[in-house]
Amino acid sequence: MKTKTLWQTIVGALVAVALPAGAHHSFAIYDMSQNIEFEGVVETVKMRNPHMALTLVESQADGSKRTINFVEGAPANMIVRMGLNPADIAVGKTIKAIGAPRRDDPNAFFLKAIILPDGKRYSVIN
């Protein structure tokens, strides 16, 4: 009986520890069914783990500017392993990016893909 209780305690503790990690990696805050493409000038880029981040400034038809925040994407090391040179998305470069919008912020997106001016595409998630 003591062994069963010990195992139940161990399994319960492991599940409790794993739950926050699962919540952290949930995409529920994004509408992943959408793929919205933007073209703009890179304003900021953070090549970091666990998630890279990118800000684009997109010119609108009326001459105004819109800031698009890709607040979460793949880990930087994954993007580099795919062949992306960080210099290709440096501040000041013009690129295209595809994102899934956050449900609570119209200017925040999950970064699904980066498309360089030569057409080369780096898909983070389908």
Where are the predicted features?
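Bacterial N-terminal signal peptides that target proteins for export
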Residues: M1-V11
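Short boundary/loop segments of OB/S1/cold-shock single-stranded nucleic-acid-binding domains
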Residues: G22-I36
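Conserved hydrophobic positions within beta-strands
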Residues: G40-V42
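Short aromatic-glycine-enriched beta-strand elements
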Residues: R48-S59
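Short, structured beta-strand/loop micro-motifs enriched in basic residues and often containing a Trp
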Residues: E72-R81
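Short nucleic-acid-contacting surface segments enriched for D/E, G, S/T with interspersed K/R
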Residues: R81-A97
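OB-fold/S1-family single-stranded nucleic acid-binding modules
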Residues: R102-I125
